[in-house]
């Protein structure tokens, strides 16, 4: 007999207290479905039973009712067991090296799942032999379907209804495509402008590749999860979300943390969560992990720094390198204002020959301001001036200029400290 609950620590204490009053003890193993859900559904936003019930279609008519909660928890456990059983055996074996960090006897569910598991690895996965880490194999792109020249037809194929203002905006975009100069189009919010500019662009045979820049990463993720997903599903359009390297997991750094003994239970649970996530993700984008804010120091340790050693175990499967390669091949690249500026500084040809759409262009000015700022550490600068003056190697003119600079910098520091 095993006691299973969603937040087992709380429920087990209540049950143990009730049994104690009757002269009994609770000695059965205890399994927590909250921690199991956190490990095996790494991209979920929440792990409340009510939220999991909506996402997984569990039977929970009335939350916080004992019978209803128990039924939904039982269904959740079956979902979790199926999910664990679907994972590669190699991943489950790695999970078991950290599973004693789960509450009470929760690891029993994982140990039970490995029995009868196939030793072979499915074609959808690839195992990096020396590390034992299993990744999802990249999926080949399907042949793109041709879009109609009629905006309303394309919207209908997406199972959406076109709106008058949206059609007007789309028509304005279509007309401007013949104009080789920069076009500026104003549109009110809430008209569905993302489809309004994407569909006319993608319908044009002479528009080869498109770069879309939006103000924030939040909007970037939103487009990828909504409009890009729909267009990819219906028309097989190849979209790619491009961000700075720090947004992606660095497999070398993650592997080093797997080799390390950590006493922090939360860190070890994150290691388990990431091992599961790596069998699912096609991007390696850490934004897919919604609960990472609980221990950002660990994620700062494993995020990419934009560098990759030639002899890296993961050179062939590095997510940041793959992301940049995918950006070269994608029909539509979605990025954000800040990273567009960074990318164009590093690669002057990044948008050459492509159609560039700057969504909410008025906000690009703010991004440019931020991008062009340079920081100077006044204390370090003052120390440097002192060293030069102490060396006595400068001419009289240089000495006077440095003394004036020394005075001004000292004055600035004093003003700041007041």
Regions found by a protein language model. Give the residues of each.
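Acidic, Mg2+-coordinating catalytic module of metal-dependent nucleases/exonucleases
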Residues: 2-19, 44, 48-111
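Acidic two-metal-ion nuclease catalytic site recognized across multiple nuclease folds
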Residues: 79-150
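Walker A/P-loop NTP-binding motif
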Residues: 175, 194-207, 226-230
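Walker A/P-loop
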Residues: 178-199
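Signature of the SF2 helicase/ATPase Hel1-core->accessory helical subdomain module
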Residues: 313-331, 337-418
